[in-house]
Amino acid sequence: MASGGVVKKEIGGNHDVVRFGVNDSVKGDLAPPHPLQASVHKEAKFWADKKRFGAEAIYGSAFNIRKDLDAQILSKFQRPPGALPSSMLGYEALTGSLDDFGFEDYLNYAAASEDGWVLGRGALELLLGGTAYTQATSAPQISLSMQQVQRRELQLVAVSAMLIDCKYEEIWAPEVNDFIFISDSAYTREQILAMEKGILNKLQWNLTIPTPYVFIMMLSASADNKSDKENAEALKFKRLSQSRQQLIDWSVKIKVSKEHGGFMRFIQVSCLGASASSSRMLRAKAAGEESVLKEFPEPLRLLISHRQSMGTCILNFHSRIQPVYVVDVAAAIVNSLKDDGTSMGKSYGLGGPEIYTVHDLAELMYETICEWPRYIDVPLPIARAIASPES
């Protein structure tokens, strides 16, 4: 997979460990052919080009997927008398109480509904793809994960979150009146601005969060997607398959993506050592692997090295980590898309050339940002007691 001293070691079954050297050069067209700015510019040009792929086509495609999501998710529980799938422009059609639906099922439905509405309206407004992506991933988190939101206010949260993200991403952000228009005057200016303030206060103004959007577009370009329409479809299905495991069921999302995208292979990026008995993060990875296997019996699994010492946690400065360069991981993904299918059904462990302790990485981080270390050594039981509410 890489030249210049790559070491492969069999660790049992179909698992291979691929260790990348520091100065390894990667074979083939692994680096994205387009620089970052060119990729973003390409996406911006696509959204502004109505002739190549009109906003109406995007809206119609999103609406069809949204209807299927309604059927998939609502079929999991009994629909109360008179309850109808919500339309793309509102949630008032969804009737019945939360007790009838079940709170977890309601979260599933609400998250998918909000994503569907955002997808269509964001495309209609011809915003930058990054804006629509950020808004589609942040609005459900704000409305469903961080606080309780009434059913009739879900669309208001989506509109206000879109306003925030436009101010953050766009050079010229739309006015509040534009959002009143796209919501069919369902909310007033005062309601939208009040919800905007509420969201910002809830987030404590922490808006700078990393998203996979740029990496998705770079990988899409490096996978020889010639059409901007293909890039948009890939971005759309990626949004539908976000790893909000507690909000939307994995198997439902993968099934929808598989049926609409016609995928022939599935590549899953997970962690080494993921199991039901691991830490919470690794347990989530293990649950994701189990859900993937339900729809794709033989996926290609790329397992990134997480920690070498099992049973330890991030609080333990002696925990060992073998980080791998993200470009090497991206190269492995791109190469797996270009092979003849022989890699399907196998698992590859990806690890870097060096092994560090958590203490080493902390020292490196503070040295890089030119700040004095802000940690103290405490006994591990005390550290666990302090961190237990957040774990």
From Swiss-Prot:
UniProt GO molecular function: cyclin-dependent protein serine/threonine kinase regulator activity
This protein's UniProt keywords: Cell cycle, Cell division, Cyclin
A GO cellular-component term linked to this record: cyclin-dependent protein kinase holoenzyme complex
SUPFAM superfamilies: Cyclin-like, NAD(P)-binding Rossmann-fold domains
Cross-referenced Pfam families: Cyclin_N, UMP1
InterPro entries: ComplexI_NDUFA9_subunit, Cyclin-like_sf, Cyclin_N, NAD(P)-bd_dom_sf
One GO BP annotation of this record: cell division
Homology family: Belongs to the cyclin family. Cyclin AB subfamily.
UniProt name for this protein: Cyclin-B1-2
Source organism phylogeny: Eukaryota, Viridiplantae, Streptophyta, Embryophyta, Tracheophyta
